[in-house]
Amino acid sequence: MLKGIHPALSPELLKVLAEMGHGDEIVLSDAHFPAHQLHHKVIRADGIQIATLLEAITPLFEYDQYVERPLAMMQAVHGDSLDLAVEERYLAAIAKINGKAPLVERVERFAFYDRAKIAYAVVITGELAKYGNIILKKGVTPVLTD
């Protein structure tokens, strides 16, 4: 354990977050997502809800401020419905840490899969909500000055 690091963050996930550069994306997927089919770098976070991971990641992660919507979620397939409370829960988790949350882009299912294929990594979580996947785009970490 490290002081100040949320216990939901595994050493492997911390390493990946540190390796990512600005503009890189990471997928936090629900438990049903075809991660291993789409990507070679898959991290397991079994039993952990995405909102919990967002609370853990947000203090360490700069969301891209140079794009209008640095978060992306899958839109419902035609004829299906999604629970908007899922998005609200995710944004509340980020806002709890940052005071506000970035905007979310809704992406068609297969376009979402295409983005997942080129993401830096995919994290499989214990999230069970339908359409519960979210992509985070990393921004430029501010330089601290004396």
UniProtKB/Swiss-Prot annotation:
This is L-fucose mutarotase. Belongs to the RbsD / FucU family. FucU mutarotase subfamily. One of its GO terms (cellular component) is cytoplasm. It comes from Glaesserella parasuis serovar 5 (strain SH0165). GO terms for molecular function: fucose binding; L-fucose mutarotase activity. SUPFAM superfamilies: RbsD-like. Keywords: Carbohydrate metabolism, Cytoplasm, Fucose metabolism, Isomerase. The keyword Cytoplasm applies. It catalyses: alpha-L-fucose = beta-L-fucose. Involved in the anomeric conversion of L-fucose. One of its GO terms (biological process) is fucosylation. The keyword Isomerase applies. PANTHER family: FUCOSE MUTAROTASE. Pathway: Carbohydrate metabolism; L-fucose metabolism. Homodecamer. The active site is at H22 (proton donor). It is found in: Cytoplasm. Its EC number is 5.1.3.29. Substrate binds at D30, R109, Y131, G132, N133.
